[in-house]
Amino acid sequence: MLRSFSHFLQIGSRRQPTYFRCFHKTTVHLNSFKNDPKKELNSNLNEKSVEESSKNETKEQFNSSSIPRESESEGKTASNTSPLSPKKVENLSKLFNDINEDVSIEELKSRFKDHLPFYENYIRNHPLAIEALQKSTAPRQTGLKLNYVSKLDKYVTPLDGYSHLGSEESNGEIPDKWEDFKDDLTFEISSKFSPFDFGDAGKSTSDAEFLSDISGIPKSDLRALMFVPLVRRRVVNQTRKGKIASMYVLTVVGNRNGVAGFGEGKAESYSLAYKQSCGRAVKNMVYIPRYDKRTVYGVIHKKFHAVRLTLRSRPAGFGLRCNPILHEICRCAGIKDISGEILGSKNGMNTVKAMFEALQSQRLPEDIAMERGQKFVDVQREYYKQT
């Protein structure tokens, strides 16, 4: 035991032994309590009070040494305004009076070398400095006309400056787009699936007005539309701040008479995502050709990503015998007789997109006749016309 302790207390060792370092710390800690703690606290408080009083005196001297401006009366004596000698005050007042507005900053520094606080006071009250401050606080004026996105946009009609969209003048400017839908939209039906409030006209803003402003379709024709949300799911985006959750909705819109469209929406809540998808679906409505206004033309094969879709025309009274998602799209588009099947993936989002691409890629008899260079005649219709 003695050997080990003497080994740790070797004088020639490079590193202090652990026992010795611990003992040294305890001795320093005990020595700090030799004096009375009450006396030390009182002395520290006295020193702080002296320092604060000296700082206050210097501040009072600086405030009292301010030089009178041109607007102040010249009859005031230097002894009343500042503790400086009267000669220094006279020299400084002459410097202030001799300075013009066009004097550079370097000249001011050379004149006020010995009195920097007076130089700072003059710079603050200089007219050029005041103009610079006013320009910095004023809004920046640029030639760019940018519309910045704000969270308040969802509470305001987004097209306030385009009130002419729903008028007859705007419809006349785009006749090709409007004439395709004009005859089909006359079919009115009270839809139970409409999420919008078509209330009294006395209301300030409504979702129906929002849709009419976006699409250019009158509010009366929006009553014939049918809104069906087909895909609803919760989406999570992983960021460095954490997981940010949002709702995704895919909605199909149609008037049950040859016009349909789909739209996607993503927002924090389900209601906002649903309204967003409905607005985009109304904007994306397209005309869908139908044979005899009830079925498709022939057999359609479509592949969209991993979805392999097949649609077949069927006779009258056959009904809709297909996937539930295809069933709702056919109802919105006004297709009454069809059979279809889906092979491969049955993802709802890709199924809707594959269905709309298939309906728009139909080969019409008129197109086939033009390709072959032959006359096209529907024998069945011509036969029943004669009888």
UniProtKB/Swiss-Prot annotation:
Sites of Phosphoserine modification: S85
Domain of life: Eukaryota
One GO molecular-function entry: RNA binding
Gene3D superfamilies attached to this UniProt entry: 3.30.160.20, 3.30.230.10
Segments forming domain S5 DRBM: 225-288
UniProt entry tagged with the keyword Ribonucleoprotein: yes
Subcellular location: Mitochondrion
Organism: Schizosaccharomyces pombe (strain 972 / ATCC 24843) (Fission yeast)
Chief location of this protein within or outside the cell: mitochondrion
Keywords assigned by UniProt, alphabetized: Mitochondrion, Phosphoprotein, Ribonucleoprotein, Ribosomal protein, Transit peptide
GO CC annotation terms, alphabetical: mitochondrial small ribosomal subunit; mitochondrion
Reported function: Component of the mitochondrial ribosome (mitoribosome), a dedicated translation machinery responsible for the synthesis of mitochondrial genome-encoded proteins, including at least some of the essential transmembrane subunits of the mitochondrial respiratory chain. The mitoribosomes are attached to the mitochondrial inner membrane and translation products are cotranslationally integrated into the membrane.
Family, similarity comment: Belongs to the universal ribosomal protein uS5 family.
Disulfide bond positions: none
UniProt keyword Ribosomal protein, yes or no: yes
Subunit structure: Component of the mitochondrial small ribosomal subunit (mt-SSU). Mature yeast 74S mitochondrial ribosomes consist of a small (37S) and a large (54S) subunit. The 37S small subunit contains a 15S ribosomal RNA (15S mt-rRNA) and at least 32 different proteins. The 54S large subunit contains a 21S rRNA (21S mt-rRNA) and at least 45 different proteins. uS3m, uS4m and uS5m form the narrow entry site of the mRNA channel.
Protein name: Small ribosomal subunit protein uS5m
